[in-house]
C-alpha cells in the first residue's frame, strides 16, 4: 500500500481531522437536546433519544463493513466517499424541519462517519514506519478522545447561535479535509476479495437497534410490555444471525477471527463496557445541569469543560505510560479513575448547586479515565494484530465502541426518561444514571485486570524465548521461537 508514505505528518493531520469530526458528532448533540426539544415539542424523551442512537447504531453496523469495503475498493476512495457523505448529511441535519427528518439525516451522517473512522486509521498505519507507528496511533486516538470529551462545551457555545450550528460546524471542516485528502493521500491496491456481507450488517442494525428501542420504551411501557419483549426477542435474533453469518460468509460483517488474539478480544470487550459508561456520562450530566440545576445549554457546556481539559493533557501522555507499563495496567487505572469520579457524583451532588466541591472533582477523575483508556485501547490494533488485519480489527474495535455508546444512551434514557419528562427536579433518576456509570467503569476495570494478566503472560513468554535465542546452541536444527497471534 502506498499511502503518501513520504508525508506521514500530513496523513496524520488529515486522518485525525476526519476522526475528530466523526467522534465529535457522537457527543456534541447531547448539549443541544434542550434547544432541539423546544423546537420539536411533540416528541417525547424516548423519541428524542433517536437523534443520538440513529447515529450510533448505524455507525456500529457500517463500521463492521467499512474495513472490508476499503480493502475491496481502496482505502482512499472509501475515506473520501465517507467524508463527503458525512459533510452533506451534516448540512441536511441543520436544515431538518422536524424530528424524523433530523433522525434520517443523522442516520446518513452515521454511515459517512463509519466509512471514515476505520479507513483513517488504516491509512495512518500504512503511512508511518513501524518504529513510530504506536506514537502516531496514540495521537490519532487522542484526537478522537478530545473530540468526544469536547462535545458538550463546544456544543454549548454553538447552541447560542442556534442548535443547527452543532451540525453546520462540520461543513467547512469537512470540505477542507476532503480537499487536503484528495491532494495528499494515495490510493491503495484493491484486494481481490468477495462482496462484503451486507445482510450481516443489516442483522447487526436490527439487533442493536431493537435492543436500544426496547430500553428506551421501558420508562413509558414497563419491562413486561409486549412491544418491549418482542423488541428483545428481535434483538437476540439479530445478534445471533450476524454471528452465524460472520462465521460462514467469505467476507463477513464482523471479522470474528481477530478475536482469537486474546489481547485484542479483551481490549474489545473493555472498549464496549467503557463506552457504555462514557456515552451515558455525557448525556446524564447534561440532563442534570439543565434540568436539576436549571442551567442554560451554554452554561452547562462550559461547566463540563474541565473534563475535556484533563483529557487533552492525559491522552498525550497515555502512550508513553503504556509503553512502559503495558496497555492493561494503564487502561485499568483509567477505568478505576472513571469509576471513582462517578461514585464521587453519587456521594456529593444533590439538588443544590455544588460545582467546585461536587461536580468539578468528578470531572477531573472521569477525564483522567477517558484520557488513559481510549488512546491505549485503540493502539492494540497495531500492536496485537498482523498488518493484513488492521482494517477489520479497527472496524471491530470501533463497532464495539459504538454499540457500547448506543447501549449507554439507551440505559440512561431508561434510568432518567420518565422523571425528566414528568418531574425535572427528581434526583433519584439522575442518581441511577451515575450508578450506571460507576457499574460500567467497574466492569471495565475487571476486564482490564484480565488484559493485564494476558500481557504479563505474553511478555514472560517473549522474554523466555529471547533468552533461549541468545543462549548457545549446538543443534543445527535449531528454530527460533515465534510469538503467534492465532491468525497465521
What are these regions (language model features)?
Residues 160-270, 277, 295, 302-305, ...:
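Hydrophobic transmembrane-helix bundles of small-molecule transporters
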Residues 35, 67-68, 72, 156-157, ...:
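Membrane-interface helix termini in secondary transporters
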Residues 71-199, 387:
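Helix-loop-helix hairpins in multi-pass membrane proteins, especially solute transporters
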Residues 32-61, 104, 298-302:
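Extracellular/periplasmic helix-loop-helix junction of adjacent transmembrane segments
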Residues 53-67, 117-121, 305-317:
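Central cavity-lining transmembrane alpha-helices of secondary-active solute carriers
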Residues 9-31, 224-231, 238, 250-459:
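12-transmembrane solute porter fold
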Residues 20, 50-57, 84, 138-146, ...:
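Transmembrane alpha-helical cores of Major Facilitator Superfamily
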